[in-house]
């Protein structure tokens, strides 16, 4: 390794040439690579100790963790005599040794140095911690390739190293046998496009915020901006004050250490998002209500109709279609049957004759549901059903937000590494969940954190309010107003009882008493009706238990009778 070499060879312009070079390097023996990495680390450690003893500058440092991983970080500081770049080179020696560059080849080391220099130039947020720490220990299950054994080991902190170092260290493991390797370039490009569309860069000017009025798009309340791992809240307040002023926001910190920033209007919300993005801060937020599209489901239109035709059809009605999506479903009628296990497997999915269309918000957007014809098709336009699922980010795989509004370093859903899911950098056979630390992927449907959030999303059943509570409340309110509730009208009274003088009320009293005796539940107040109902249910359950016992005894008696008949038939002379 050249510690002070500031000149690096540039990357090949063609990606195929780069991959071909990596394939040539991957032909080395893994055992040889392992020994070379360990020897290089040992020599680096000795040189670092001698350099630190004889100089006042910060020179290479070597760290070794408890899970047999070896990390070598080389940093060349800026001195008065010379100014060089910052390089970060790391290698991991674990249960599965991936294809790594042998010592002495400068092509991959130069590539890693360039990526490390790019990560170093990104900068650091002044009020945010460099790494994302976790207080709970996570259990990891190591599944070794071509073996049956499973070794359980414990990792105390998955994100102790900064994401920039982890990203640079993962470049040494470009070539692998990962099944998601074919999706690497596509996943990276998609995520870059998402960030470019939804997150503003630092080169754009922050718009002037008028704090004396609400946003022109609508008076809706802006969502919270969540900033994790804030170690210097005073610096955060200074950054927000310089952006939108001290009377335009409020902060609330949760028990998990996430600082939620609430702004007074949409203009302040957009200004804070752009300012935090320019500071290279890691945070996430949600979409403004006025920016959310109006999603409708168009039924009755053929699946092969071009999207441009649908856009023109909505434009004729005065609506702007932002996005059009045709859902797919499995075609079980044309499924192929595997010869090995005789199980039907779906080989493709067919498009449904339905479209989900995102329309731009407007004052008359609700009239889109009255559309009955689009072009030559008679259609039915309905409001798209809301998905009752847990929202999970496909970038950092944390629940509660989406990838389009996540400005955090990517985390792999398989190994919890600091790289995109499905990229060439994922070469580990370790499954690690980001949310619970279990030995499964972060997108697993059986994750206990996901199950708990689903349980909280379901509405809890409400118990019926007893009648006596309502009646008593009404009676108390009537008494407070000075009204006396009228007496109940007595029933079962004859003509003689009505015309009898008031002094003799024997028959009427007897009639009422006889009514009470005939209906014992009448003596109970309305508050005891539930107790009486519960008692009746218990009696019914007891009777049902007795009935089940009688039925069981009857079945056993019939069985014994049949056996007796069979014995008698067998003893009869032929």
Curated annotation (Swiss-Prot):
The keyword Metal-binding is annotated on this UniProt entry: yes
Gene that encodes the chain: gag
Pfam families documented for this protein: PRE_C2HC (PF07530)
Gene Ontology MF term list: zinc ion binding
Source organism phylogeny: Eukaryota, Metazoa, Ecdysozoa, Arthropoda, Hexapoda
UniProt-listed InterPro entries: Pre_C2HC_dom (IPR006579)
Main function: Strongly basic protein that binds directly to retroviral RNA and may be involved in its packaging and in the reverse transcription process.
Keyword annotations from UniProtKB, A to Z: Metal-binding, Transposable element, Zinc, Zinc-finger
Zn finger (unnamed) start-end: 393-406, 412-426, 433-447
Protein name: Nucleic-acid-binding protein from mobile element jockey
Positions of region (Three zinc-finger-like regions): 393-447
Entry superkingdom: Eukaryota
Parts forming coiled coils: none
Disulfide bonds: none
């Amino acid at each position: 390794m050249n510690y002070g070499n500031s000149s690096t060879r540039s990357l090949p312009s063609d990606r195929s040439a780069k991959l071909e070079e990596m394939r040539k390097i991957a032909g080395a023996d893994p055992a040889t690579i392992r020994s070379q990495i360990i020897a290089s680390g040992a020599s680096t450690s000795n040189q670092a100790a001698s350099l630190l003893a004889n100089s006042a500058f910060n020179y290479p440092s070597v760290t070794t963790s408890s899970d047999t991983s070896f990390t070598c970080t080389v940093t060349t500081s800026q001195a008065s005599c010379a100014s060089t770049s910052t390089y970060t080179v790391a290698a991991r020696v674990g249960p599965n040794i991936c294809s790594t560059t042998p010592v002495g080849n400068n092509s991959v080391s130069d590539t890693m140095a360039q990526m490390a220099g790019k990560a170093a130039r990104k900068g650091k947020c002044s009020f945010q911690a460099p790494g994302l720490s976790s207080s709970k220990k996570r259990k990891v299950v190591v599944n070794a390739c071509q073996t049956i054994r499973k070794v359980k080991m414990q990792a105390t902190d998955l994100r102790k190293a900064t994401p920039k170092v982890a990203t640079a260290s993962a470049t040494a493991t470009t070539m692998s046998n990962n099944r998601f390797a074919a999706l690497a370039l596509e996943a990276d490009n998609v995520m870059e496009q998402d960030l470019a569309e939804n997150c503003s860069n630092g080169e754009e000017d922050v718009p002037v915020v008028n704090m004396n009025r609400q946003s022109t798009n609508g008076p809706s309340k802006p969502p919270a901006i969540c900033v994790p791992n804030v170690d210097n809240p005073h610096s955060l307040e200074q950054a927000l004050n310089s952006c939108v002023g001290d009377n335009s926001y409020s902060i609330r910190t949760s028990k998990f250490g996430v600082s939620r920033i609430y702004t007074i209007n949409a203009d302040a919300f957009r200004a804070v998002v752009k300012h935090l993005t320019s500071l290279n801060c890691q945070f996430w937020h949600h979409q403004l209500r006025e920016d959310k599209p109006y999603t409708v489901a168009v039924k009755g239109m053929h699946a092969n109709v071009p999207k441009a035709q649908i856009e023109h059809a909505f434009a004729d009605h005065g609506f702007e279609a932002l996005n059009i999506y045709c859902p797919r479903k499995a075609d079980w009628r044309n499924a192929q049957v595997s010869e090995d296990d005789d199980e039907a497997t779906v080989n493709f999915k067919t498009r449904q004759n339905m479209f989900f269309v995102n329309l731009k918000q407007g004052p008359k957007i609700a009239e889109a549901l009255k559309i009955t014809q689009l072009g030559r098709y008679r259609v039915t336009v309905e409001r798209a059903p809301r998905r009752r699922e847990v929202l999970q980010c496909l970038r950092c795989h944390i629940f509660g937000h989406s990838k389009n509004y996540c400005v955090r370093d990517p985390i792999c859903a398989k190994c919890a590494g600091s790289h995109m899911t499905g990229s060439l950098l994922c070469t580990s056979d370790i499954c690690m969940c980001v949310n619970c630390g279990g030995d499964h992927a972060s997108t697993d449907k059986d994750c206990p954190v996901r199950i708990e959030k689903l349980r909280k999303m379901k509405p809890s059943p409400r118990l019926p309010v007893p009648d006596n509570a309502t009646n008593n409340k009404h009676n108390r309110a009537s008494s407070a107003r000075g009204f006396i509730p009228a007496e109940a009208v007595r029933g079962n009274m004859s003509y003689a009882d009505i015309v009898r003088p008031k002094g003799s009320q024997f028959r009427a009293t007897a009639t009422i008493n006889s009514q009470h005796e005939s209906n014992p539940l009448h003596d109970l107040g309305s508050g005891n009706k539930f107790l009486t109902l519960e008692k009746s249910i218990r009696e019914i359950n007891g009777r049902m238990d007795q009935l089940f016992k009688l039925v069981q005894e009857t079945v056993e008696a019939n069985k014994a009778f049949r056996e007796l008949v069979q014995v008698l038939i067998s003893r009869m002379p032929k």
